[in-house]
């Protein structure tokens, strides 16, 4: 019988049971507990120690942009090869010359022609990955799937991460049925469906309040036949977001505690979900208590949490609590935005 692998020493079957129980409780109480209800391509920073004659990633991107815009795709191919040799990997701007204009179709066909001619291995695979991500950004999902087929036929290293931008785009647009068909396509090529792939579905359902579908996604994660799968930080972030959107602060807090018990790092955004719902629900004192419970561990987190809370309190005219938070920020030497700094000077320092 399949079991989820414990992250540390906690049986994550219990975790999933807890999360599904929240769904059941939400349905029984007529609340929609939506909590169970980058792969992005980062720009590689230029090497600061590079010799003066060595090109940077930005320079390679600019050269590829000029070559692609002028229709010189042999130059594009050479640049794709040479940039990897020089440790200047592809970025989100590499295929920026490809846009939704009249030249789109011909440019894409030229790219399909030259990509199989790039250096075999990482260079070729990553070029396909980067182009697929670009097509998804342009909303050209069908063309992205054509490239997937090209990779499969050519045996160019088709892998799970290649599908991530497609699944991300489809689920964000609530094209769930299409996204599941992409999952079936992955399986047809013997490509494993990883936790990130499932997270795209889970986030979409939690955001929309589809309790039943989110619960089904969790079950699919448990039953995944490719191997042991554990929820990750993004999984729990989606669950906390869903709980907060349904007004279930206690459920969000329970999930947050579960993350800490299992040793998972908590995203700044996850804290923001909880803070926002507490203020929205009128739990002002509790929101202050919540941010203070995490204060002192991470300066940037403190700036995000305390600053966000202060802004929300001021917007709701909860000036007493806002002053308390701003005093704490001042004592801790935390950075304030212009609006908060002005409020602090007028209402805290001069009071």
Curated annotation (Swiss-Prot):
Residues 1-41 form a transit peptide. It is found in: Mitochondrion. It comes from the Eukaryota. The keyword Transit peptide applies. PPR repeats lie at residues 124-158, 159-193, 194-224, 232-266. Pfam families: PPR, PPR_1. Keywords: Mitochondrion, Repeat, Transit peptide. Coiled coil: none annotated. GO terms for cellular component: mitochondrion. Transmembrane segments: none annotated. The keyword Transcription regulation does not apply. InterPro entries: Pentatricopeptide_rpt, TPR-like_helical_dom_sf. Its main location: mitochondrion. Belongs to the PPR family. P subfamily. This is Pentatricopeptide repeat-containing protein At3g56030, mitochondrial. It comes from Arabidopsis thaliana (Mouse-ear cress).
